[in-house]
Amino acid sequence: MNTLNKTLLSVSVALGLNACANVQTAKTYDLDFSKQKYTEQSIEVNGQAVKFRAYENVVYVRNPVDTRYEIINIYVPEAYYNGGEIDGFTAETAPIFLPNQIGGYMPAEPGKPALESKRGEPEDGQKSPNAALTALSKGYVVASPGARGRTESTGKAPAAIVDLKAAVRYLKANDKAMPGDAEKIISNGTSAGGAMSALLGATADQKDYENHLKALGAAEGSDKVFAVSAYCPITDLDHADMAYEWQFNGVNDYKKMNISMLDYRVKRE
């Protein structure tokens, strides 16, 4: 093969790869909430059936980088579609519980309401409602966003907080189209997720993120939340590293431990 043909082949391959990359990211999404795309679900909590509509895997930006994570699961108590009330809340007044599943600043898919085994107990033992299911049973609308994270090339900072802000903007943009009061969004997370939840509250409408949000095609408007629920938020990473060094000083033996991504069950192998 002569030099010209080799050059043409290289250019063709490069163009082909570029075209494939564009196919993966070229699709744009509508940010209007679709009321008809749901499933009806019911889970028993304390002897009572908690019935709700599940709107899952909803892309919350027009130009997502990764649709594995830039999606949100929305759950609405069925009573709100029949003019009902739960603990004094209605379709117009119900707060929106926004729990993220972020751990270790890694990518996180949206969460779901479920009955789960308590930490340290066997899988076949007694199960309790998780936070999302508990919130539903109390009349909250639940919206659990996914977010990109540090183990992916597309998840470097500030990707995670930008994704959470975009999810909040999606809910506010669709406030009139869905049950729940988007002025009463309560963000929730644990550990790194708690840190991201705290950051979401502290950086409300911060202009430094605007270009990132525009690049994703996030809905315009505010990303302010009403309240933050942050469990053991790990925010001061430099001092945390020093604390680990102090705590484990002189500990030189290591045994591998596997920790599952969402339920943090420790398994020594």
Regions found by a protein language model. Give the residues of each.
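Primarily recognizes the serine-hydrolase "nucleophile elbow" in alpha/beta-hydrolase
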Residues: 173-250
